[in-house]
A protein has these predicted regions:
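Extracytoplasmic/secreted envelope proteins and their assembly/folding machinery
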Residues: 37-44, 60, 72, 133, ...
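Low-complexity, intrinsically disordered terminal/linker segments enriched in charged
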Residues: 80, 112-116, 120, 125-129, ...
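Short beta-strand edge segments in extracellular beta-sheet folds
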Residues: 135-137
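Surface-exposed, charged secondary-structure patches
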Residues: 27, 67-128
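Short, low-complexity N-terminal intrinsically disordered segments enriched in polar/charged residues
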Residues: 24-57
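C-terminal segment of classical bacterial N-terminal signal peptides
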Residues: 16-24
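Bacterial N-terminal signal peptides that target proteins for export
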Residues: 1-11, 20
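Short, solvent-exposed secondary-structure junction/capping segments
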Residues: 48, 52, 56-80
Length: 164
């Protein structure tokens, strides 16, 4: 009986320490995911695993997870109205390219400017160095992407405006 009780106590202690460690990892993940650069990194991960918000019509919530309403509306409308054909977004908007051979990919630390966070994604595509800047704003649901800035000041929003 004593051995049984000790075994139960030891197992309970092990279980509780595991729960505590899991809780700590979850808190750390939540804290990291609350940053602008974490949202951008998650967007790239989702797109790489073919579960990104672009070119899909299954889930508006997936678009809203990453983008502020204005840009989200444009992305969603483009996906829905293009019906599997090429829409306004005619390449991968995360790399500003149709063909990709990505090397030296990095997401920089966010910097604040005029109440917005700016996050740079840098990489080489077929040997050409590129920087794409994400403009994020913080709302009730956390950080969301307001626009994406490409070379020479062209933006994802401007692509939609030019297509009208």
């Amino acid at each position: 009986m004593r051995i049984f009780r000790k075994t139960i106590l030891v197992l309970t202690a092990i279980l509780l320490s595991g729960v505590g460690a899991t809780h700590l990892r979850a808190q750390t993940r939540a804290a990291v995911s609350g940053t602008p650069e974490a949202l951008v990194a998650d967007l790239y991960r989702a797109q790489k695993s073919k579960r990104g918000p672009f070119f899909q019509t299954r889930s508006r919530a997936l678009v809203d997870k990453y983008f502020e309403k204005g840009l989200g509306d444009l992305i969603w409308k483009d996906a829905r109205t293009s019906k599997g054909e090429v829409g306004v977004i005619d390449g991968d908007p995360l790399y500003d390219a149709q063909d990709m051979e990505i090397k030296h990919f990095a997401i920089g630390k966010s910097r604040m400017e005029e109440g917005r966070a700016l996050v740079d994604a840098t990489f080489e595509n077929f040997g050409e160095k590129k920087t794409i800047t994400y403009i994020l704003v913080k709302g009730a649901a956390g950080w969301r992407i307001r626009d994406i800035v490409y070379a020479e000041g062209r933006t994802l929003k401007s692509e939609f405006k030019d297509a009208r």
